[in-house]
């Protein structure tokens, strides 16, 4: 096609494009900056981050998943890494900080190879081979454990909580005991010896007041609500529970309407009709044999009165997530309309009771039809402490779920990373060619984990790494960093520091895939932000300043 001499506009005005090595290096830098931010939070001696949102709310935590969720990341490559970390948290509930740190290290090593004019495709191929070999080696190094033994679960939970707010003292022991009891309750054994654990059966309810030592495990569901009417029973045994997703109120017309009453008798008949409709609703509920009503919507005051007269305990405006948990626990079917109500839709529990917890009242549903439903009722001095304790408990629950799903462990404290690095360097020599350089770089990146752990313990990181390499070359495959005592151990499993193999494999896989995804990008096309609407009284210069292209800062 002949050129016409006129400019050809492909992209919308204001669109910013970066391509080639410049785009790749910018993406690598963004990911490395994010990894550098999280690095100091890794391990038992990891430091906390204080996160302040746009409303001034403060979160203090060293939990990697919480940090990446709360941070407002702007650069697209860093956002990609954040999404990988979130996926790691959703998949196994642990190892989010490790994923980001390892991905950052892999990209740092890749950048050095790019400086040596190694093509990104070769680096990607080398990293892919290294990842596959690393996953095979982790399985090879893993040691089976007897998960029927509570002491094994306790040590896994201790390792998970070592870097957390509740990592020491009687509070830790209390939480670990509750978590083990909860997991044992909801776990179902598979024919292959592993377990299936549905954590949806474990509810965490927080109530300010008291201390963490006042927390307890309830075998049932706890609702942060109170009985709606003072005349209703506060305790119902052999409860037949109606779970509603519908209001016990007279429905208002969807259209705006006005009713003009010219006669007082007509007003009375109108009110009587409303009362009759509400009475009929309650009669229909009572006819099924229900003696407890739990609804997501509201309950009219007149309906409350009739329910109380029937001796029915009622709770209103319960969260959707709690409604689903109650239905699952009691075997009830969520009813969306009273027209569909049948006795077989009711759930069952041995006891529904309102109890005072601190200064508030809560409703306890115990002895549910499904015995696998439990609630961890957390107590604490303030909301910040309770939020962090909740995050810690979720981490411990996921850690135990992972070891039950695949009952194998590897040494903690960076032991498995050093072992993998040693074996991958040997593997690289068998591959040869330029891919050998990429596999060796991958191996060096793995050593970032023990290096960071050693730094957090106040040790000389280089000296610690050299000693670990020496021990692993002598056959000590679980030699690692004892962060709490600031020394190198020949076998981390002997001091009860180990990790579920499922988590370790997912960390390697997620970090590798994140790094490879970023290395595949050679063109970044960012659309211009939408221009603000022109405001009256603005000068032309001010209007001009509102436009412009995209800009990424990190």
Curated annotation (Swiss-Prot):
UniProt region (Disordered), positions on chain: 530-554
Species this protein is from: Aeropyrum pernix (strain ATCC 700893 / DSM 11879 / JCM 9820 / NBRC 100138 / K1)
Alphabetic keyword roster: ATP-binding, Chaperone, Nucleotide-binding
Alphabetized GO MF terms: ATP binding; ATP hydrolysis activity; ATP-dependent protein folding chaperone; unfolded protein binding
Protein name: Thermosome subunit alpha
Family named by the database record: Belongs to the TCP-1 chaperonin family.
Gene3D superfamilies cross-referenced by the UniProt entry: GroEL, GroEL-like equatorial domain, TCP-1-like chaperonin intermediate domain
Biological role stated in the UniProt entry: Molecular chaperone; binds unfolded polypeptides in vitro, and has a weak ATPase activity.
């Amino acid at each position: 096609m002949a050129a016409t001499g006129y400019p050809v506009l492909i992209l919308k005005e204001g669109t910013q494009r970066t391509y080639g090595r410049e785009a790749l290096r910018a993406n690598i830098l963004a990911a490395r900056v994010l990894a550098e931010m999280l690095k100091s939070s890794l391990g038992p001696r990891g430091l906390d981050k204080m996160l302040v949102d746009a409303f001034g709310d403060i979160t203090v935590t060293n939990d990697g998943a919480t940090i990446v969720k709360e941070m407002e990341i702007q650069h697209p490559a860093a956002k990609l890494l954040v999404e990988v970390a979130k996926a790691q948290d959703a998949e196994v509930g642990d190892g989010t900080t490790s994923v980001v740190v390892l991905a950052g290290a892999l990209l740092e090593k890749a950048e050095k190879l790019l400086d040596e004019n190694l093509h990104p495709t070769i680096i990607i191929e080398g990293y892919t081979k290294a990842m596959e070999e690393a996953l095979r080696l982790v399985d090879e190094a893993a040691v089976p454990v007897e998960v029927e033994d509570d002491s094994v679960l306790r040590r896994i939970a201790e390792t998970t909580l070592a870097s957390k707010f509740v990592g020491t003292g009687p509070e830790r022991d209390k939480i670990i005991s509750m978590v083990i009891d909860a997991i044992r309750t909801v776990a179902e054994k598979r024919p292959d010896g592993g377990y299936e654990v549905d954590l949806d059966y474990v509810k965490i309810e927080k109530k300010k007041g008291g201390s963490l030592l006042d927390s307890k495990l309830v075998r049932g569901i706890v609702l942060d609500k109170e009985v709606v009417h003072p005349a209703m029973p506060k305790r119902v045994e052999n409860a037949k529970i109606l779970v509603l997703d519908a209001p016990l109120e007279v429905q208002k017309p969807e259209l705006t309407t006005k009713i003009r009453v010219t006669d007082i008798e007509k007003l009375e008949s109108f009110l009587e009709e409303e009362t009759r409709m509400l009475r009929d609703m309650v009669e229909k509920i009572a006819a099924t044999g229900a003696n407890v009503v739990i609804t997501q919507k509201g309950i009219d005051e007149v309906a409350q009165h009739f329910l109380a007269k029937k001796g029915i305990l009622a709770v209103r405006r319960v969260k959707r997530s709690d409604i689903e948990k109650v239905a699952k626990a009691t075997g009830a079917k969520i009813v969306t309309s009273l027209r569909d109500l049948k006795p077989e839709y009711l759930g069952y529990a041995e006891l529904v009771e309102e109890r005072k917890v601190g200064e508030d009242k809560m409703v306890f549903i115990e002895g549910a039809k499904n015995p696998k439903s439990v609630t961890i009722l957390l107590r604490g001095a303030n909301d910040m402490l309770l939020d962090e304790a909740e995050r810690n408990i979720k981490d411990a629950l996921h850690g135990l779920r992972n070891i039950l799903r695949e009952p194998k462990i590897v040494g903690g404290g960076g032991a498995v990373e050093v072992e993998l690095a040693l074996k991958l360097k040997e593997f690289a020599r068998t591959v040869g060619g330029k891919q050998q350089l990429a596999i060796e770089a991958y191996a060096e990146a793995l050593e970032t984990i023990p290096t960071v752990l050693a730094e957090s313990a106040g040790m000389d990181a280089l000296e610690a790494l050299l000693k670990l390499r020496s021990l692993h070359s002598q056959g000590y495959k679980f030699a690692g960093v004892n962060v709490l005592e600031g020394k190198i151990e020949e076998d981390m499993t002997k001091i009860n520091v180990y990790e579920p193999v499922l988590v370790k494999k997912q960390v390697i896989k997620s970090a590798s895939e994140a790094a490879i995804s970023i290395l595949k990008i050679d063109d970044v096309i960012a659309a211009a932000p939408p221009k603000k609407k022109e405001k009256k009284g603005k000068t032309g210069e001010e209007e001009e300043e509102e436009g412009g292209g995209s800009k990424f800062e990190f």
